[in-house]
Amino acid sequence: MSVMVLGTASHVGKSTMVAGLCRILRRRGISNAPFKSQNMSLNSWVTEDGGEIGIAQAMQAHAAGIPPCVEMNPILLKPKGDQTSQIVLLGRPHHDVHACDYYKVTDNLLTIALEAAGKLMSRYGALVVEGAGGAAEVNLFDRDIANIGLARALKFPIILVADIERGGVFAQVYGTISLLPDDIRPLVKAVIVNKFRGDPALFSDGMRILEEITGVPAIGLVPVTDVDIPSEDSLSLQDKKTKSAPVEIAVIHLPRISNFTDYEVLERYASVRYVKPGTPLSGFDAIILPGTKNTIEDLEEVIASGTGEEIKKARTQGVPIIGICGGYQMLCEEILDSGIESKEGTFHGLGLIPCRTTFSGYEKTTVQVTRTSSGHGPFLEKIASVSGYEIHMGTTCRGDIREAFSGEGVVSEDGLLIGTYMHGLFTSPHVAAAFVTFLCDRKGLTWTPPAQDKDPFDTLADHIEAHVRIEEILPFFN
């Protein structure tokens, strides 16, 4: 048997709860795998065989102690703007689709998703399935493939997760359960109230009332916790809080920012601020231009807002600047698009590196990589090798400039301007620590990275086990 985790809304903590359950089951010797039929996210991961899936499912696979694979997230939607998304099907880019046309093909997609779930079950036994958004989107019941349609096909016991932090938890839970179709409502076996703040004893009556009005056991009141695992979507950027740290790094919060999880390890060591285009960049110790799902349109926003000139000014002042993936492409002199990434045309980049990027075909590079650092400059000399992954359309032709890593990327003569396609550069703690050390050295500061002596997935599992009656969930896996 397996379990399905649905939510009363987006950002209630489904992904984190699934990751915690995957680790709890693993610690009890129960083989399991995560599964999410359809995910909409610009944060993605590359599997060992070059497939692309949502980063949440990769994170959950790590919690379960198994390698991520494309069956864990067979349908990934990557928004490009103008109500258009790229469909990534079983890890490969399939086609772009307008929102009003997507639901015309969901029957076929549900079949693909169920086949993927079946393969995972035959391989690992149990599944911990994650729904998408809110479960009670009644206007989508007839075509939904992530919540109701999937629940109807799988018939797994359902755990409903609610977010008390945003308020209205009674309406969230009661309303969601009441609105579920008659054949789905009996599958709801447990409710978990997430993101609680304060003394749990003060909500004991609330848990009792939830059980009385829904007839469903309320098995957990889980306090807010700061566990160091990747975020899934851009809503989490709203929750990030700036902390006091020896250095301050600006990450340009592009309208279509992707893979912002690249910088979450840096947040352990530095004050990382996600600043929107138009925000003054003076005073930062480093600037990062991140990835984007639409390089051209976000580049136009960077230029129109004045941020492009701010970045150029920072370059003349010797501020370290790093462009990753789409940010790397923006640093180029010129971008040629045949209508693949955005509209057709030739566009001027920021002109900080002598390179040209070309989008000429509907082909995407998705690959895990390990590369040797060139060792050129005060940052790259601190690291020997790096591991990460590439996810990008287009190719960049390097001009008269040094290579940053073996076979990829660029670095300026002074070593302060770096462009690379490598996502995950800073998710390696030794690279993130080396970058912060480099920035501290420039300020004459002595800094030592703090030790992390416990697996964050074990920390998460311990936290959930302390506040959820796990013994009421375990029978679902017999």
Swiss-Prot record:
The keyword Nuclease does not apply. The active site is at 325 (nucleophile), 423. Pfam families: CbiA, GATase_3. This is Probable cobyric acid synthase. InterPro entries: Class_I_gatase-like, CobQ/CobB/MinD/ParA_Nub-bd_dom, CobQ_GATase1, CobQ_N, CobQ_synth, GATase_3, P-loop_NTPase. Gene3D superfamilies: 3.40.50.880, P-loop containing nucleotide triphosphate hydrolases. Residues 246-431 form the GATase cobBQ-type domain. Pathway: Cofactor biosynthesis; adenosylcobalamin biosynthesis. It comes from Methanospirillum hungatei JF-1 (strain ATCC 27890 / DSM 864 / NBRC 100397 / JF-1). Belongs to the CobB/CobQ family. CobQ subfamily. NCBIfam families: cobQ, PRK00784.1. One of its GO terms (biological process) is cobalamin biosynthetic process. GO terms for molecular function: ABC-type vitamin B12 transporter activity; catalytic activity. Catalyzes amidations at positions B, D, E, and G on adenosylcobyrinic A,C-diamide. NH(2) groups are provided by glutamine, and one molecule of ATP is hydrogenolyzed for each amidation. Keywords: Cobalamin biosynthesis, Glutamine amidotransferase. It comes from the Archaea.
